[in-house]
């Protein structure tokens, strides 16, 4: 992995993007979304994993995360990707499960694994997380806004907090919960929240 893509601060805030290989729309199916979310919940409970903001889109995940000592963020992310990839493949390879795209998905994931030094038969996640260390309140706020507005820009919802698979409901405090609890950064008030509370004239 390139040095520029390494997580330097294992316990600080990092913004990361985790795309599915080939940008395949894997997460249009609830079963694959639940694999990701269940694994996150496990990491939160057992591996010191803190998810401060996130959105789960059809073909990628954006998140701001940190890790409590003695755990290391890069190791938790590695294990999370391995586990979710393994569970996804198990589901795809079990022909008793309903999946109309089974052959197509397995073909694509095997194709993208060809010639890779990791010597995998299938590759589901792109290997890099593209971490960006967050060092100021302004940058943190910008990234939270970007994450939460993803579903709005894609046309899936009108308001960020209406996207179930994100932390926006926690920040908006308008709904009981999103899909996975978020460790809210209490000092940060996202710009989009002001926008929807005050209206465009407040900008």
Regions found by a protein language model. Name each.
Residues 1-203:
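Short catalytic/metal-binding and nucleic-acid-binding patches
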């Amino acid at each position: 992995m390139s040095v520029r893509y390494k997580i330097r601060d294992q316990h600080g805030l990092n913004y990361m993007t985790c795309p599915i290989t080939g940008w395949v729309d894997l997460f249009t199916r609830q079963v694959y979304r639940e694999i990701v979310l269940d694994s996150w919940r496990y990491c939160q409970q057992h591996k010191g994993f803190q998810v401060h903001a996130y959105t789960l889109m059809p073909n990628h995940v954006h998140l701001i995360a940190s890790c409590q000592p003695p755990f290391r963020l890069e190791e938790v992310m590695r294990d999370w990707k391995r586990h979710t990839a393994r569970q996804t493949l198990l589901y795809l390879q079990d022909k008793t499960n309903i999946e109309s795209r089974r052959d197509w998905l397995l073909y694509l994931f095997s194709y993208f694994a060809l010639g890779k030094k990791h010597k995998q038969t299938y590759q589901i996640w792109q290997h890099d997380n593209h971490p960006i260390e967050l060092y100021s309140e302004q940058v943190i706020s910008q990234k939270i806004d970007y994450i939460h507005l993803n579903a709005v820009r894609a046309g899936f919802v009108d308001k960020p907090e209406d996207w179930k698979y994100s932390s926006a409901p926690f920040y908006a405090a308008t709904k009981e919960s999103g899909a996975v609890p978020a460790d809210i950064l209490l000092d940060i008030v996202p710009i989009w929240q002001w926008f929807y509370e005050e209206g465009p004239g407040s900008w």
